């Protein structure tokens, strides 16, 4: 019994061991099968494995532009402020009560237009008095002259002494002097009356009124009645570095007016175009700049006094210049360079000499020719002689459309 019992346990143990061995054998085969595709894929991707490993990687995508030949203007730029050609504070020349205002705030007026009236009563009275005194003295003079004529006849017969004749002559001369004084008084009174009507001294735009009708005003008031700014034409005062003076003077010697453009604060919109008026006669030693004044017609009222603008003055135009986008110009240890594409879309580095430059384009004086293709984007991935793929610039709209399409595709896959 004991022998048969031991035999059964031996059989059970052998079966368990066989089952465990079979399980490990089956698990090992599954692992080798799942590892085989990965190994194959690695072999395909390995540079030394299979035909696919012998193929080159994808070409670097770049954007390119063609160098063109064109006329390029040269501008000098500066910051400036619009100033009125003339600014006049309209004040009363006489004292009195303000009776009427004949303008609308902000309107354009012409020189001589009536702006305000002061009560003329006192000035009319003064004029009448002066005219009356003049008439009286004229009558006195006429009588004195008649007496003088009689004295001149009587002195011949010794009925009147020579002394009396001289006295009468002096009286006539004195009265003539009084007449001149009276005439001046009349003119002064008339002037005072005229000044009670206040007119515009210059063409321009009136500002806000400084006094209301009914107030007593005087010639000593500093605030005045209203301020007129002449805006047709209007001036731009800006500064240039002293190093640009020679360029401006040389351009002026050509005999043509230099064009000055006024751009808005963000330098994105041209407001108006005028001409150079003058340079200041001295340099500001503190800033090393010189003041420049330009004049604009401003019939469209695009410019306003005290407005901040960016000024651009055209001083020269470079003809037949080779121009490329500014993004293509790079700077290295050897100097400025660009990447040039040949007919096989292989790139090579060309050292260049840049000229006039702005945020959009740059003139190349030496190093490339018109018609050469230069890389403008994807430059950081380039090496000498590398072959690249030239792609078109992708607009923001296109990017948004593609992103939207991908989002719809994801939603469709989830649904």
Curated annotation (Swiss-Prot):
Stretches with biased composition (Basic and acidic residues): 399-415
Name of this protein: Multidrug resistance protein MdtA
Record function comment: The MdtABC tripartite complex confers resistance against novobiocin and deoxycholate.
Organism: Escherichia coli O7:K1 (strain IAI39 / ExPEC)
Designated gene of the protein: mdtA
Entry similarity comment: Belongs to the membrane fusion protein (MFP) (TC 8.A.1) family.
Annotated stretches, region: Disordered: 32-56, 392-415
GO MF, any single term: efflux transmembrane transporter activity
Gene Ontology cellular component terms for the protein in this record: efflux pump complex; plasma membrane
Subcellular location: Cell inner membrane
């Amino acid at each position: 019994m004991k022998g048969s019992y031991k035999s059964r346990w031996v059989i059970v143990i052998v079966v368990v061991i066989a089952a465990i061995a079979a399980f490990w054998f089956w698990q090992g085969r599954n692992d080798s099968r799942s590892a085989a595709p990965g190994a194959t894929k690695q072999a395909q991707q390995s540079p030394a494995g299979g035909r696919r490993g012998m193929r080159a990687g994808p070409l670097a995508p770049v954007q390119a532009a063609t160098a063109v030949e064109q006329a390029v203007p040269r501008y000098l730029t500066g910051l400036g402020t619009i100033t009125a050609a003339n600014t006049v504070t309209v004040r009363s020349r006489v004292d009195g009560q303000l009776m009427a205002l004949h303008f609308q705030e902000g309107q354009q007026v012409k020189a001589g237009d009536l702006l305000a009236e002061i009560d003329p009563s006192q000035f009319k009275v003064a004029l009448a008095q002066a005219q009356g005194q003049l008439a009286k003295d004229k009558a006195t003079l006429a009588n004195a002259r008649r007496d003088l004529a009689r004295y001149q006849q009587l002195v011949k017969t010794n009925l009147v002494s020579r002394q009396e004749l001289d006295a009468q002559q002096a009286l006539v001369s004195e009265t003539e002097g009084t007449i001149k004084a009276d005439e001046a008084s009349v003119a002064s009174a008339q002037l005072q009356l005229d000044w009670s009507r206040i007119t515009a001294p210059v063409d321009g735009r009136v500002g806000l009124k400084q006094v209301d009708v009914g107030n007593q005003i005087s010639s000593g008031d500093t605030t005045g009645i209203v301020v007129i700014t002449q805006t047709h034409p209007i001036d731009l005062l800006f500064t240039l570095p002293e190093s640009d003076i020679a360029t401006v003077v040389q351009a002026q010697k050509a005999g043509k007016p230099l064009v000055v453009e006024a751009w808005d604060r963000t330098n994105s919109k041209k407001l108006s175009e005028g001409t150079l008026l003058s340079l200041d006669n001295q340099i500001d030693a503190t800033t090393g700049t010189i003041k420049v004044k330009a004049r604009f017609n401003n019939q469209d009222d695009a410019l306003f006094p005290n407005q901040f603008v960016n000024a651009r003055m055209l001083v020269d135009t470079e003809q037949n210049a080779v121009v490329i986008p500014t993004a293509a110009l790079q700077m290295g240890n050897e100097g400025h360079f660009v990447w040039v594409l040949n007919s096989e879309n292989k790139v090579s580095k060309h050292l260049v000499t840049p000229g006039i430059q702005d945020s959009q384009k740059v003139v190349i004086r030496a190093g490339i020719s018109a018609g050469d293709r230069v890389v403008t984007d994807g430059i950081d991935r380039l090496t000498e002689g590398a072959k690249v793929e030239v792609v078109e610039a992708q607009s923001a709209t296109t990017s948004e459309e593609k992103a939207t399409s991908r989002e719809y595709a994801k939603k469709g896959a989830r649904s």
